[in-house]
UniProtKB/Swiss-Prot annotation:
InterPro entries: PduO/GlcC-like (IPR005624), PduO/GlcC-like_sf (IPR038084), YBR137W-like (IPR010371)
Provenance organism: Burkholderia ambifaria (strain ATCC BAA-244 / DSM 16087 / CCUG 44356 / LMG 19182 / AMMD) (Burkholderia cepacia (strain AMMD))
Protein family: Belongs to the UPF0303 family.
One family name in Pfam for this protein: HbpS-like
PANTHER family in the record: PTHR28255, UPF0303 PROTEIN YBR137W
Domain of life: Bacteria
NCBIfam families xrefs: PRK02487.1-4, PRK02487.1-5
Name of the protein in question: UPF0303 protein Bamb_1459
Lineage of producing organism: Bacteria, Pseudomonadati, Pseudomonadota, Betaproteobacteria, Burkholderiales
């Protein structure tokens, strides 16, 4: 895995995966799409979709644990703070050889810069929330969310997927 290349690719994902509008019905449709995809693949994950301050969708699939719910919360907090993918922030910290606690004073008990939370962006409004998955390895959590967003937004996932490591 090349960190610089992944960061460039994640930036392209964040630019491309923008909703024209977003409401609770769209959150429900996206959440159900993610649930069906995860179920078909046998993923034991938690799925979370929020606008900042309001939960819109949550599901814990068979095999997911309370730890997954806490990882969701901590990854979601990274997106809320930085308005960037939690994976991008984690890769930046890795590049810098620093932690969120060292560099930004953010406690690991509340912030986790691991892959799986992606900014929910609306055209003309910016980042309004996050879409998060937890239960797979961090790169796979990130790509699961991106794949679902591509399907929901009619984007070509193959063109936006991270390079295979």
């Amino acid at each position: 895995m090349d960190i610089a290349h992944d960061l460039q690719s994640i930036g392209a994902q964040e630019q491309a995966l923008v909703f024209p509008h977003f409401d609770p019905a769209r959150a429900w449709a996206l959440g159900n799409r993610m649930h069906a995809l995860a179920t078909a693949r046998g993923h034991a994950i938690a799925i979370d979709i929020v606008t900042f301050g309001q939960p819109l969708f949550y599901a814990a699939l068979a095999g997911a644990t309370p730890d997954n719910a806490d990882w969701v919360r901590r990854k979601r907090n990274v997106v809320a703070h930085f308005r960037r993918s939690s994976y991008a922030i984690g890769l930046r910290m890795q590049q810098a050889g620093a932690s969120l606690a060292d560099k930004h004073g953010l406690p690991i008990s509340d912030y986790s810069p691991h892959g799986g939370s992606f900014p929910l962006t609306v055209a003309g409004a910016g980042v309004i929330g996050s879409i998060t998955a937890s239960g797979l390895p961090q790169r796979a959590d990130h790509e699961f969310v991106v794949e679902a967003l591509c399907a929901e937004l009619g984007q070509d996932y193959a063109a936006l997927a991270l390079a295979r490591s």
